[in-house]
A protein has these predicted regions:
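Insoluble glucan recognition modules
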Residues: 1-101
């Protein structure tokens, strides 16, 4: 399965057809490294469109570390400082992390 990032991250914008592919590191675990600005907002999608596979911050916009499925999520919001960060998502555990590199 492929997993993508969409939003104002790595210059791709909210056009899902331009979504950025995450790297699979193990079963259900994906990561991507990028510089993140102070107003970063993104979602995780399972196809290059806004379809049924859509994950974001659980229940609404924020940065809780927990993902929610389509219909029960908002944008993941992160305040970066222009440094490089690793975004890791574990779809099986329903969690994500954003760590400075």
């Amino acid at each position: 399965a492929e997993v993508y990032l969409v939003g104002n991250i790595a210059g791709n914008g909210w056009d899902a057809t331009n979504a950025i592919s995450m790297t699979k590191v193990s079963n259900g675990v994906y990561e991507f490294v990028s510089t993140l600005a102070s107003n970063t907002e993104f979602k995780i999608i399972g196809q290059k469109s806004f379809g049924s596979l859509d994950w974001g911050n659980i229940s609404g916009d924020g940065n809780s570390g927990f993902i929610g499925p389509k219909g029960d999520n908002g944008n993941i919001k992160f305040v970066g400082d222009g440094s490089s960060y690793k975004i890791t998502v574990n779809l099986k555990a329903g969690v994500y992390t954003i760590k400075k590199q």
